[in-house]
Amino acid sequence: MKNKYLTLVALSGFFCVALGAFAAHGLSHILEAKALSWIDTGLEYQMFHTIAVLAVALSALRDNKFARLSMSSWLIGILLFSGSLYALAFEASNVIVWITPIGGTLFLIGWISLAYGSFKSKSL
C-alpha cells in the first residue's frame, strides 16, 4: 500500500456517504430526532476530518512526522468520536459515551500537531 492514508480516507468517505444516505432515507422513520442528530454530528466530523486527512496526504507535508501524527490522530478520532455517536444512535450501551471525548481530544491533537509540524518544517 503506497499511501495508506489515501486508502483509509477513501474508505472513510465511502462509509460517510453511505451512512448519510442510509440515515436520510432509511432511518428517518425509525430513529428518534436525538439519534438522528447524533448521526448527523458524527457524519459532519467524519467528513470534515476525512477531507483534512486527504489534504495532508496529498500535500508536501505528508512525510513530516507531525503530519503523519495528525493524520493518524484524525483517523483514530473518527473511529472513536463518530463511531461512538453512531453506536449511541443505534442504542448501544451508554458506557460508550465516555469514548466520544477521547475521539474529540484526538481531533485536537491532530490539529495542534499539524500546526507544529508545519511551523517547524524547513521545506515549506
UniProtKB/Swiss-Prot annotation:
Transmembrane segments annotated in the record for this chain: 6-26, 70-90, 95-115
Main subcellular location: membrane
Domain of life the protein comes from: Bacteria
A single Gene Ontology CC term: plasma membrane
Membrane topology label: Multi-pass membrane protein
Cellular compartment(s): Cell membrane
Record's keyword terms, sorted: Cell membrane, Membrane, Transmembrane, Transmembrane helix
Transmembrane helix recorded as keyword: yes
Family the entry assigns: Belongs to the UPF0382 family.
Protein name: UPF0382 membrane protein HI_1073
Organism (species): Haemophilus influenzae (strain ATCC 51907 / DSM 11121 / KW20 / Rd)
